[in-house]
């Protein structure tokens, strides 16, 4: 299963979230039907754009708690000093994808940025 980890600025639109996921899947060479879940930090729970895309795709939306993001931080490949200072992890999208995928999840696409949103893809044998 592929988990899309999402980071975004406050108020990011559904179209922007959908676009960054589509770009990530294309870069990784995956069809949309390989996507099994969308993950984002729990503090993004009010972001309607992320929820709308999960609903549109018929996928579970997994809200990752801060301790779980931090536990996955060592497995992140990208690093933003600004994000680290603000969020406590080097990459929100990567940490969310890895944490939601579980301890055996592996990044198959490091964080990409498209406008106000970021997406990273992790692969896992687990189901959400």
Model segments located where?
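Conserved mixed alpha/beta catalytic, RNA-binding, or beta-rich assembly cores of soluble enzyme
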Residues: 1-36, 40-42, 122-128
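Structural motif
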Residues: 2-4, 36-37, 62, 105-108, ...
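Predominant activation on well-ordered alpha-helical scaffold segments within soluble catalytic domains
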Residues: 18, 22, 51, 93-99
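Generic secondary-structure signature for well-ordered alpha-helical cores
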Residues: 22, 26, 30, 40, ...
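Long, charge-dense
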Residues: 41, 47-92
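C-terminal edge-of-domain segments
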Residues: 94-128
């Amino acid at each position: 299963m592929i988990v899309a980890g999402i980071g975004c600025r406050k108020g990011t639109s559904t179209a922007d979230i959908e676009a960054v996921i589509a770009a990530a899947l294309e870069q990784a060479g995956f069809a949309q039907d390989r996507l099994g879940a969308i993950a984002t930090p729990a503090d993004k729970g009010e972001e309607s754009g992320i929820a709308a895309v999960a609903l549109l795709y018929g996928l579970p939306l997994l809200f990752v708690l801060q301790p779980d993001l931090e536990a996955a931080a060592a497995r992140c490949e990208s690093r933003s000093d600004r994000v680290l200072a603000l969020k406590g992890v080097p990459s929100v999208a990567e940490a969310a994808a890895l944490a939601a995928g579980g301890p055996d999840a592996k990044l198959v696409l490091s964080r990409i940025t498209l406008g106000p949103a970021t997406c990273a893809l992790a692969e896992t044998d687990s189901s959400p």
